[in-house]
Amino acid sequence: MSRMAEQQLYIHGGYTSATSGRTFETINPANGNVLATVQAAGREDVDRAVKSAQQGQKIWAAMTAMERSRILRRAVDILRERNDELAKLETLDTGKAYSETSTVDIVTGADVLEYYAGLIPSLEGSQIPLRETSFVYTRREPLGVVAGIGAWNYPIQIALWKSAPALAAGNAMIFKPSEVTPLTALKLAEIYSEAGLPDGVFNVLPGVGAETGQYLTEHPGIAKVSFTGGVASGKKVMANSAASSLKEVTMELGGKSPLIVFDDADLDLAADIAMMANFFSSGQVCTNGTRVFVPAKCKAAFEQKILARVERIRAGDVFDPQTNFGPLVSFPHRDNVLRYIVKGKEEGARVLCGGDVLKGDGLDNGAWVAPTVFTDCSDEMTIVREEIFGPVMSILTYESEEEVIRRANDTDYGLAAGIVTADLNRAHRVIHQLEAGICWINTWGESPAEMPVGGYKHSGIGRENGVMTLQSYTQVKSIQVEMAKFQSIF
């Protein structure tokens, strides 16, 4: 693909040049080619976007629930019509296999938008009787202008997960995509405008997180920030949001999630789940189950089943329908993952497979890392304690249920957890003791629109998806009505 035209900001229904004068490049990690130069939003651009959003939000919030619902449903239709086009762009920018982006990224994002479009008329207040002459009623009102700050692993899906409930509740959103993968969020802005969203209700500001993101979190005109990313960055976002104007925040942060295989489990099922929990999207999924706990007596058999499945991984041309494994999103990220792999070897973990870059067959110029499985791991190892965000699985053994629950919870993270067992009593007993916000029994990874997702501990604050997220983009106003004559004590 030839280099794209320079990408601008999207403010008030159209493209506009950044005032900062700064740019950055976005690359295709499959081959290292530059896809486009992208303009970076500065402080003045954030001010412009907020003013635009304030204007648009008043128009949007004044529409009826059904009018807003119809516009968002039109956007859903356009997303589905353009699925292939958007998936190809997402593959170029992220490196993910087209077999994945064409069936997951836009599809699941559109589902979430459709879900919230349908929920708009359900945003209702309540009536509370006090006595014969007085009652209270409540209104759910939009927050106003909110900000979304996205991560690089699911660019358009995250933009939809954040914008759908915000817009459904009558807010305007300013969205900052990751500087690593900024392209499809700009296309989403075009689609919203085409669907009839008033100008300013969805503005997109590409830029560097430490600058553009910070300006958004500090801006007094923004009522809430929804952030997806790492724990350290999340803490900065939260601190800035609180220090500036006590903004509400939603944080979807990192994870080091446990997958527990019990001795009664079907090991073929367990191996299939472990593969998806570690190597889907080349391991760049925040909910990955990278700490795989297996009974000591099952370890050898489980390892053989994992090795057999690693042989089915097909890396190569990311647009080949048979490819199911792509490069990492960038060269700096690849190098960071490789440092973790070296650390795992140094600390005594045994490499079962992988452990290096992938080369040959057109892969030499890309950010490729081989699917890597470590075994003979222990809880104190760096690769077991820290989030790697790459195709690296750690196999650990255990002896008892009590032991594995304790060790599974021995982490600062609490995003996800899963178990594989044939015993439903055990399944529920154990899941109820795991300190994680998203849990799976005999499956892994699905996050449907109806399911609230978010973390415990350092893995986040608040939830995305589900009814409660729509409500979190509103504020409740209570109004008392008195029909009798008011009595003053003065």
Curated annotation (Swiss-Prot):
The gene name on file is betB
The active site of this protein is located at K162, E252, C286, E464
Which Gene3D superfamilies does the entry link to? Aldehyde Dehydrogenase, Chain A, domain 1, Aldehyde Dehydrogenase, Chain A, domain 2
- Protein source organism: Escherichia coli O139:H28 (strain E24377A / ETEC)
What protein am I looking at?
Betaine aldehyde dehydrogenase
**Keywords assigned by UniProt, alphabetized:** Metal-binding, NAD, NADP, Oxidation, Oxidoreductase, Potassium
> Which residues bind NAD(+) per the record?
G150, A151, W152, K176, P177, S178, E179, G230, V231, A232, S233, G254, C286, E387
As cofactor, the record names: K(+)
For the biological process aspect of GO, one term held by this record is:
glycine betaine biosynthetic process from choline
